[in-house]
Amino acid sequence: MENMRSENFNQGVSMEGVKHAPEMANTNRRALRDIKNIIGAPHQHMAVSKRGLLDKPAAKNQAGHRPMTRKFAATLANQPSSAPLAPIGSERQKRTADSAFHGPADMECTKITSDDLPLPMMSEMDEVMGSELKEIEMEDIEEAAPDIDSCDANNSLAVVEYVDEIYSFYRRSEGLSCVSPNYMLSQNDINEKMRGILIDWLIEVHYKLELLDETLFLTVNIIDRFLARENVVRKKLQLVGVTAMLLACKYEEVSVPVVEDLILICDRAYTRTDILEMERMIVNTLQFDMSVPTPYCFMRRFLKAAQSDKKLELMSFFIIELSLVEYEMLKFQPSMLAAAAIYTAQCTINGFKSWNKCCELHTKYSEEQLMECSKMMVELHQKAGHGKLTGVHRKYSTFRYGCAAKSEPAVFLLKSVAL
């Protein structure tokens, strides 16, 4: 036994069974960057040993504990240290934690930046929701009709706060004011040509009496609605026309023509009694319903959306008055006629197709939807100065109406439609 002690004194304490702290940290603990112990990193299931170095069983060949004497301490101090002694107690735990965090000196370290880390789930969801909201907002901006009433905000007569509701009501009720495009089949003594002659003559009368535009459109509407319900003989067709104009003047005008003037216009073909009796018959047939949306109601609104000038306004009214004479145009609703007239007028003036987003949003008609009606209007423009029904052409050939009838029709629309 004494020999063994002396041998140990000479050779030093055997440290075979003791592993150095850095080496043990390598085998039992992984660096924090390796085990993804970082905020926001994805969770990974690992089996990591959590037993400290003190809990490990002693090695088989580890020497037993002995008291530290002065001689033993001097021997250890003089002996060259081939390997550092394992720290004991709290110092060992401190070094173990440091080595676990920093890792051994020869281990390769990878620097992790914020760009390398995966985005948290909430951040990704916020980005997706934000992009979707932006898309929805852009769609709302694109679909919203531009404000064309800001210039009339201080005009109480413009009723800006109610204008959208008013025109929504017009759009819903315009179908009730329309007549069947085939109503002439129920007439026995008159036809569509006679209707055209009557309206062409009334346009001249309207021009001579200097009546309002809305009066003319309401006159034509009253005539069509009455003829669609009552059979009229040929000799009383003119009487229906002048009486319808009298009713329209009472509804729209401030100063109404007297009955005697209408008798003179008809070359005394009818008496005062005839006109008053026909007036009573018309209002009873129509049940006193005179408040109907005509193409004129939509013309003013759509011209405002088109930011029209005087030239475009006169051209638009020239084209739509040509449509009043044509019986075949009854198949289109008043809003369609108004929008198509403005579209055709823009094409006529500019020489190319012109229909912007503002016009489309306010009229609720696309360029494709207007094309059929616009094509027919171009054909009416082409033959306006020829034939027997030239009242509209003569009216709009004057300087008072900007000589709109002398403009070249937009024949390129006919070619584009044919394609």
UniProtKB/Swiss-Prot annotation:
Please name the GO terms that the record assigns under molecular function: cyclin-dependent protein serine/threonine kinase regulator activity
Which portions of the sequence form the region Disordered? Answer: 79-116
Recorded hits in CDD domains, A to Z, give: CYCLIN_AtCycB-like_rpt1, CYCLIN_AtCycB-like_rpt2
**Which body tissues produce this protein?**
Expressed in the root apices.
Keywords carried by this UniProt record: Cell cycle, Cell division, Cyclin, Mitosis, Nucleus
Q: Read off the SUPFAM superfamilies from this record.
A: Cyclin-like (SSF47954)
What biological-process terms (Gene Ontology) are attached?
cell division; G1/S transition of mitotic cell cycle
Question: Induction of this protein: by what?
Answer: By gibberellic acid (GA3).
A Gene Ontology cellular component where this protein is annotated is: cyclin-dependent protein kinase holoenzyme complex
- Protein's cellular compartments: Nucleus
* Cell cycle in keyword set: yes
What the entry lists under InterPro entries is as follows:
Cyclin, Cyclin-like_dom, Cyclin-like_sf, Cyclin_A/B-like, Cyclin_C-dom, Cyclin_N, Cyclins_cyclin-box
- Per the record, the domain of life is Eukaryota
Record Pfam families: Cyclin_C, Cyclin_N
Q: Does the keyword Cell cycle apply?
A: yes
What's this chain's function?
Involved in the control of the cell cycle at the G2/M (mitosis) transition. May associate to CDKB2-1 and activate CDKB2-1 kinase activity to promote cell division.
Q: Identify its protein family.
A: Belongs to the cyclin family. Cyclin AB subfamily.
How it assembles, according to the record, is: Interacts with CDKB2-1, MRS2-F and MRS2-G.
Q: What is this protein called?
A: Cyclin-B2-2
Q: Which organism is it from?
A: Oryza sativa subsp. japonica
